[in-house]
Each structure stands twice: as structure tokens, then as C-alpha cells.
């Protein structure tokens, strides 16, 4: 029978000092012996997805204490990728994931906490907390802040839906008037919550639900809706049950590594491919799998991508649907239900409620459930009122979207495409693979061959695109923006958005060893591995070379002979210590970022730290 970790600090005369300090936090004699459960919050006024979380930690803590636990809350950092985008701030986004994971480990282990409730929401916060949860392997439940409502405005006498990406594209489009750009900017992000499309934040929160570490509805129920409050209340109660199951009943099925096992990881990736999620999720799932000591690699993702169809299409891949529409169609479990009927899921998995996948679908799949309360929850919709307050409205759709032939979520028979929304490409240009979000690629450019224009920074590429130096048919390559080379593996949302602004969204390709925002669409290929700073072929290409992309056949080739590539590699290595560094880039890199770069692996490993360098 495992002993409560917290007993280390609460029992025995030699811990009198620790108990004295616990008492100073409000604990009393009756609390010593109860499980100490930490509420890992991520409130900040910098991030719309987190601006409403201040009071939600207290809500969870009250339920923990009412259920027989002791609650202790702390906060992690949270970077807003959209605000950090397009300048030096983006260098810090991905490294913040490791800091978040480490900070959770530090706080939990330093104070011997027994379990956690993780209140996350946005891009690097959810994966950072996931990595920590699987590293620590103590009972955990995730409850996120929820998605933002989609923006709406009237343009050309038509009401259209908007999101952050629309503001970026219109702001850079020379054909758009200042008045229209301003109107879109003011309408794009109307409420608190994670940006309203299937961008990285919402993709990750959906995957957490598929992994079994959060409750049904967590990935799609709007941040503003009153129904979301119940998820927080339930999390506080349920974590005490999970904690006692493990520590008092020796039930290891309550631990995250036994819930989010390899079968669950495969299900989560299957969901990601079917819903056309952000390419960043690949990076984060690979990193989380390493923390869980699960053998889950790019090869597994490649195999899944070849058999899973696209059953859901959401912004930025279409303007018709946003997360509020996914929820109306049944949310994550609506998609999982269709995947299950197609025989594409591992059924022998459980979630934090203790339900198997078939049991969960029976209760929560809107196409089969008889539970009217569940149907009501999935009718929770937007209010269209600007607010930063959680649970501030209780509007509902008049009906559910259960049309699996022409609705937001489709059945296998009526899939958007036979191929899924993500694909892994291999070739002499990316020997260890690269990722493309096929859900956002127009059918006309699934095969694309063109001349290369090489840039050694995102800034240079943006200047060239906006300056008219990139033309139809070009393959834009941005290198030395990987985990080491950036450092920090910047997102390339501005270059892809500006290609659209210049009318080149369906006429050019963009390839990088950096990564893309979940808001990216178009022929955008990222995570090229090995990266330039690690000696990848991407470091050897020159202006005017030709790259051939063949998504249906999962291929990306630099059209040069092996002899020419070898000769260029020899010339590159002759540069000595500067061999795998950009030639003409001036960039201020802080000591903190240099420390990150010194241990970072390429994207095919999840951009995690290289344990071999630390003797691990």
C-alpha cells in the first residue's frame, strides 16, 4: 500500500518545523493525514485564454476540501503565442513548455503533494503540465479554461465568423481598407478563452480529453458558458476519489501513466489526424510520451496518418466552423464515436471517471445517448457578448448538429477526405521526417514542385514576402529556426498569413525547421528533422534549387544528386565551429535561451532535452 507522499512533511517529531509552517498556511490538526492536493493554476492577465482563471482555482480548492482533501494552489507562467508572435518574444514560447513542466515538478516534489488538478488552457501550458503529470505519475485531472467564442462582424452586408488569423491576414493585406482591418481586429477575439479555431490550444485540450485525463466536454465547452463551472466542481471532487483509490486502495489504475498509456496515445493521435489539429500537437505528444516512458514515435504517427480519414474540419481549415460548432456536434466524443464505429480506436482504455471508452461513448456520444442532460450540455452555445468572465452566460443552440453526412463532424462514409488532417513526409530533405497539416492544404497543391528561396530567419522571409520578392510557384525555406537553431523553434504564423495577404496562399509552399501556429493553413511544412543547426540537409540548400513535395505519397525531395549534397556538406563542415550556424543573421540570444538550445533535440524527438547529455 503506497504511503501518502505528504506524510513525509506532516508526520513525526522531526517534522515539527514543517508542520509549524503548514499551520501558518491555515492547516490544523485535523488536516494532517489528509491528502494534500495541489491546484496547479496558470492565471495571468497577459493571455485571454487564462485571464478568467484567477477564481477558478479557488472553486476547485473548495471542492477538494469539502471532499476530504487539503488543497494548496500555485501558479505557473503562461506565454501568449499570439502576442509573442512575429518578434523576438516567440523565441521564448516553446522553451516555456520545459519551464512549466519543471516548475510543476519542483513545487510538487518540494512540498510532497499527493495529487494535482491542472488548470491549463493555452499553447504551451497544457503540454507543459501534461509532461509534468506523466513525469511525476501521481493522480491528476485536467480542467482547462475553455475555448473563446468565435468573433462575428458584418462585411459586404454579410455576417461572417472571425478569429485571430483573420485579423492578422487583413491587417497585412494592402487591398483591405484601414476601416475594414480595424473592424475585423475589434471583432476577432470577443471573449476570454483559447482562440476559437482548432489551433494549438484547443487541439491540445481535445487530446487531453482523448487521453482520458479530463472529463467529457472539457475540450470544446465554451469558456463563457455556465455549464463549464460543473467541470471545475467535479474535478475537485473527483481528484479526491482518485487520490484515495491509489493511496488507500493500492489501485494503480488511478495513475496518469495507466490512463494515458500507449493505446490512449494512439487514440489521441487518431483524433488529432481526424480533426485536422495543429501540427504542434505532434511535437507535444512526442514529448509527453517520453515523459511517460512510452515508445511512441514519428513512425507511429506516420502509420496512423495513412489510415485515418478527416472527419472534422474547423477554422483555420474552413471559416464555416469554430470550436463552438464542434461542441454543438458532440465535441471530442462526437468525433471519437465516429472513429470507434470505423474500427479505428483502441477500446480498452479508461478515463479519469473510471469509464472505458465504450461506456463513455454510450453516455456521451450525442448520436446514441439517451441522457437528456448530456444533450443539453452539448447545446451550450455562444452569447456574442464581449467579456473576460468565466461562466457569464447560459445561451443554448436550439438543436444539436448530429448530421454526420453534411454537418461539422462526419461519419466515415461522408468523410471530408480519405486522408487525415496531418501527414508525415520523408525524403532526402527531411530524413527524420517533417509535418504538414493537410487539412489546410488546397487539393490543387497536394503535389508541388518549385524553385527555392532561402531565408535564415523568419524576419527576412516576412520582409521578402511583403516586399513582393516571393512570387507564384516559389518554395520559401526558412531555416535555423529549429529548437537549437532559433533557438526556441519559432512559429511561422506571420509568413503564412502574409502569403495569403499577398494572394499567394494557394500558389507557394513554405518549409521550415521551425514550427507553425495552429492557426496556419496552406502548404506549410514544418518540424524538418534534422534541423539546420543539427546538420540537416535544410542547411545545405541554395537559392534556385528545386524541391518536390508529394503529400499523397508522403515524400519531400531536394532534387540534387547525392554527390552534390555530399560536396555541399563537406564545404559546410569546413566552416569549423560555425558550420551549422546562419551566415548572415544578427540575433540577440539570452543566456536562458542558450541554455535551452544546448540541450534541445530536433522536432522528431519532441524538441525535449537530450538526456544523453545529462547522463540520463
Swiss-Prot record:
Catalytic activities: (2R)-2,3-dihydroxy-3-methylbutanoate = 3-methyl-2-oxobutanoate + H2O; (2R,3R)-2,3-dihydroxy-3-methylpentanoate = (S)-3-methyl-2-oxopentanoate + H2O
User: Which positions does UniProt annotate for Mg(2+) binding?
Assistant: 81, 123-124, 491
Gene3D superfamilies, A to Z: IlvD/EDD C-terminal domain-like
Residues binding [2Fe-2S] cluster, per UniProt: 122, 195
Cofactor(s) the protein requires to work? [2Fe-2S] cluster; Mg(2+)
**Subunit-structure text:** Homodimer.
Function per UniProt: Functions in the biosynthesis of branched-chain amino acids. Catalyzes the dehydration of (2R,3R)-2,3-dihydroxy-3-methylpentanoate (2,3-dihydroxy-3-methylvalerate) into 2-oxo-3-methylpentanoate (2-oxo-3-methylvalerate) and of (2R)-2,3-dihydroxy-3-methylbutanoate (2,3-dihydroxyisovalerate) into 2-oxo-3-methylbutanoate (2-oxoisovalerate), the penultimate precursor to L-isoleucine and L-valine, respectively.
State what protein this is by name.
Dihydroxy-acid dehydratase
Amino acid at each position: 500500500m503506497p504511503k501518502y507522499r505528504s506524510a513525509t512533511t506532516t508526520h513525526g517529531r522531526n517534522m515539527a518545523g514543517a508542520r509549524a509552517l503548514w499551520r501558518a498556511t491555515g492547516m490544523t490538526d485535523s488536516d494532517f493525514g489528509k491528502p494534500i492536493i495541489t491546484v496547479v493554476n496558470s492565471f495571468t492577465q497577459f493571455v485571454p485564454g487564462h485571464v478568467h482563471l484567477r477564481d477558478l482555482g479557488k472553486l476547485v480548492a473548495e471542492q477538494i476540501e469539502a471532499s476530504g482533501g487539503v488543497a494548496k494552489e500555485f501558479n505557473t507562467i503562461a506565454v501568449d503565442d499570439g502576442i509573442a508572435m512575429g518578434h523576438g518574444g516567440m523565441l521564448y514560447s516553446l522553451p516555456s513548455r520545459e519551464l512549466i513542466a519543471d516548475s510543476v515538478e519542483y513545487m510538487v516534489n518540494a512540498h510532497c503533494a499527493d495529487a494535482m488538478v491542472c488548470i491549463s488552457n493555452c499553447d504551451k501550458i497544457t503540454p507543459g503540465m501534461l509532461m509534468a503529470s506523466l513525469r511525476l505519475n501521481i493522480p491528476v485531472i485536467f480542467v482547462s479554461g475553455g475555448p473563446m467564442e468565435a468573433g462575428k462582424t458584418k462585411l459586404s452586408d454579410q455576417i461572417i465568423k472571425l478569429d485571430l488569423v483573420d485579423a492578422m491576414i487583413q491587417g497585412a493585406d494592402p487591398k483591405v481598407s484601414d476601416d475594414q482591418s480595424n473592424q475585423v481586429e475589434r471583432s476577432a477575439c470577443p471573449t476570454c478563452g483559447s482562440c476559437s479555431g482548432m489551433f494549438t490550444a484547443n487541439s491540445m485540450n481535445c487530446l487531453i480529453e482523448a487521453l482520458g485525463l479530463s472529463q467529457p466536454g472539457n475540450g470544446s465547452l465554451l469558456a463563457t458558458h455556465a455549464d463549464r463551472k460543473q467541470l471545475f466542481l467535479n474535478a475537485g471532487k473527483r481528484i479526491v476519489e482518485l487520490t484515495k483509490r491509489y493511496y488507500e486502495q493500492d489501485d494503480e489504475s488511478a495513475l496518469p501513466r495507466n490512463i494515458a498509456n500507449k493505446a490512449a496515445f494512439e487514440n489521441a493521435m487518431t483524433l488529432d489526424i481526424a480533426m485536422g489539429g495543429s501540427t504542434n500537437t505532434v511535437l507535444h505528444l512526442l514529448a509527453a510520451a517520453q515523459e511517460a516512458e512510452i515508445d511512441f514515435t514519428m513512425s507511429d504517427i506516420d502509420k496512423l496518418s495513412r489510415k485515418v480519414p478527416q472527419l472534422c474540419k474547423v477554422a483555420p481549415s474552413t471559416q464555416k466552423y469554430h470550436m463552438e460548432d464542434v461542441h454543438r456536434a458532440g465535441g471530442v466524443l462526437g468525433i471519437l464515436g465516429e472513429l470507434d464505429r470505423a474500427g479505428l480506436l483502441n477500446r480498452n482504455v479508461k478515463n479519469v471517471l473510471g469509464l472505458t471508452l465504450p461506456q463513455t461513448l454510450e453516455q456521451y456520444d450525442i448520436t446514441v445517448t439517451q441522457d437528456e442532460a448530456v444533450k443539453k450540455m452539448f447545446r451550450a452555445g455562444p452569447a456574442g457578448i464581449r467579456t473576460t468572465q468565466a461562466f457569464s452566460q447560459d445561451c443554448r443552440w436550439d438543436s444539436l448538429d448530429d448530421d454526420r453526412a453534411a454537418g461539422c463532424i462526419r461519419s466515415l462514409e461522408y468523410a471530408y477526405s480519405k486522408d487525415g488532417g496531418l501527414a508525415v513526409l520523408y525524403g532526402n530533405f527531411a530524413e527524420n521526417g517533417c509535418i504538414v497539416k493537410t487539412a489546410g492544404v488546397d487539393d490543387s497543391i497536394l503535389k508541388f514542385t518549385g524553385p527555392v528561396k532561402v531565408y535564415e530567419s523568419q524576419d527576412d522571409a516576412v520582409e521578402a514576402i511583403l516586399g513582393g520578392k516571393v512570387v507564384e510557384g516559389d518554395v520559401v525555406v526558412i531555416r535555423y529556426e529549429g529548437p537549437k537553431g532559433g533557438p526556441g523553434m519559432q512559429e511561422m504564423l506571420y509568413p503564412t498569413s502574409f502569403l495569403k495577404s499577398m494572394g499567394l496562399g494557394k500558389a507557394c509552399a513554405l518549409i521550415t525547421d521551425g514550427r507553425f501556429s495552429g492557426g496556419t493553413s496552406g502548404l506549410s511544412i514544418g518540424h524538418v528533422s534534422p534541423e539546420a543547426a543539427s546538420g540537416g540537409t535544410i542547411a545545405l540548400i541554395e537559392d534556385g534549387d528545386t524541391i518536390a513535395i508529394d503529400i499523397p505519397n508522403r515524400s519531400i525531395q531536394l532534387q540534387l544528386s547525392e554527390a552534390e549534397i555530399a560536396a555541399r556538406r563537406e564545404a559546410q563542415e569546413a566552416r569549423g565551429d560555425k558550420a551549422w550556424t546562419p551566415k548572415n543573421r544578427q540575433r540577440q540570444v539570452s543566456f536562458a535561451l542558450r541554455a535551452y538550445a544546448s540541450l534541445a533535440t530536433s522536432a522528431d524527438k519532441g524538441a525535449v532535452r537530450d538526456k544523453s547529455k545529462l547522463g540520463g
